[in-house]
Swiss-Prot record:
The lineage of its organism: Archaea, Thermoproteota, Thermoprotei, Sulfolobales, Sulfolobaceae. PROSITE patterns: RIBOSOMAL_S19. Belongs to the universal ribosomal protein uS19 family. GO terms for molecular function: rRNA binding; structural constituent of ribosome. Transmembrane segments: none annotated. Signal peptide: none annotated. Disulfide bonds: none annotated. One of its GO terms (biological process) is translation. It comes from the Archaea. HAMAP family: Ribosomal_uS19. This is Small ribosomal subunit protein uS19. InterPro entries: Ribosomal_uS19 (IPR002222), Ribosomal_uS19_CS (IPR020934), Ribosomal_uS19_euk/arc (IPR005713), Ribosomal_uS19_SF (IPR023575). Keywords: Ribonucleoprotein, Ribosomal protein, RNA-binding, rRNA-binding. Protein S19 forms a complex with S13 that binds strongly to the 16S ribosomal RNA.
Length: 140
């Protein structure tokens, strides 16, 4: 699981640990660094879908496929250090939203980076849509 760390990530620390320390750290030690919600989620274990995604990630790392995007519907996986540097595409209910996992994302969920709703932008009301439109000039 070798990862070439870009220069801008060299100084990054998560709870006082560098990226190299996080990558070499056993899972139970890493879990202790997480906030309570993520810690409890990981202590319960991985679901089948999460396990399958992590196996796929490990396979891509072994083969050195860092530029290939991994598509997934799994939104409830906590971002682990082994996901750093990979391109992920998480389904938001309509399409896959693509992003690259950075060290700042550790401890967050994948779904946080694939927003499921968008801001509603209402258009202009049509002719006779409201009582006030009675006084508008007829569209020609």
């Amino acid at each position: 699981m070798s990862l070439e760390i870009p220069p801008e990530w060299k100084n990054f620390k998560y709870r006082g640990k560098s990226i190299d320390e996080l990558l070499n750290m056993p899972m139970d030690e890493f879990i202790k660094l997480l906030p309570s919600r993520q810690r409890r989620s990981l202590k319960r274990g991985f679901t089948d879908a999460q396990r399958h995604l992590l196996e796929k990630v490990r396979k891509y790392r072994r083969e050195g496929k860092f530029n290939k995007t991994i598509k997934t519907h799994v939104r409830n996986l906590v971002i682990l250090p082994e996901l750093i540097g990979l391109k992920m595409a998480v389904y938001n209910g309509k399409e896959f939203v693509e992003f690259t996992v950075t060290p700042e994302m550790i401890g967050h969920y994948l779904g946080e980076y694939s927003i499921t709703t968008k801001k509603v932008e209402h258009g202009e009301p049509g002719l006779k849509a409201t009582r006030s439109s009675l006084f508008l000039a007829m569209k020609g």
